[in-house]
From Swiss-Prot:
Residues annotated for Zn(2+) binding in this entry: 97, 99
InterPro entries attached to this UniProt entry: Aldolase_II/adducin_N (IPR001303), Aldolase_II/adducin_N_sf (IPR036409), MethylthioRu-1-P_deHdtase_MtnB (IPR017714)
UniProt pathway annotation: Amino-acid biosynthesis; L-methionine biosynthesis via salvage pathway; L-methionine from S-methyl-5-thio-alpha-D-ribose 1-phosphate: step 2/6
Pfam families hit by this protein: Aldolase_II
HAMAP family associated with the record: Salvage_MtnB
UniProt name for this protein: Methylthioribulose-1-phosphate dehydratase
Gene expressing this chain: mtnB
Keywords of the record: Amino-acid biosynthesis, Lyase, Metal-binding, Methionine biosynthesis, Zinc
Subunit structure, interactors included: Homotetramer.
Species, as recorded: Bacillus cereus (strain ZK / E33L)
Amino acid sequence: MKQLFRQWYDLSEIKKELTTRNWFPATSGNISIKVSHEPLTFLITASGKDKTKTTPDDFLLVDHLGVPVLETELRPSAETILHTHIYNNTNAGCVLHIHTTDNNVITNLYSDAVTLQNQEIIKALDIWEEGATIHIPIIENHAHIPTLGENFRKHIQGDSGAVLIRNHGITVWGRDSFDAKKRLEAYEFLFQFHIKLLSIQGGVSNGANSYS
């Protein structure tokens, strides 16, 4: 029980911080944190909640299938399946899914992946070589959540990573809450920088492979 309360507090603090950046517009997004490994349980945001508010109903505990462990009227976030795929296939400890203008714009500039390089902040992703290059996969959005989940699952590699969903934000996971938040901040910085650079250089015709 002590671990549950500790993880609840940790996830609540992350929610507060991301809220100050307006990364949960219009109740969008969902975040989770692992509570136990065997059996697998994790806390995840309840569906349809205003994340700018802090309430006792912010999170609920679910199992490896995303089913609530305790009796509750709360429903887990619609994209819980993305979280279950990550936790069931890695040793990740925290998953963050947010919608921002920048990460949605990026998914409209590129088709299957976006390549970013030569930025010091890439070191936040535990990539240390000089002038490093990263590739972030982009998958299509699907209203049918199981289809979205299956396409997402194909890109889960390792205990930390990220996947962009076309016009549906980014999902980032890490070894723990600190690692996941650090990675999310790095990706959002890179997206913002990339978009600003393209605007200075004259738009996508001079810098990006436009996706349409």
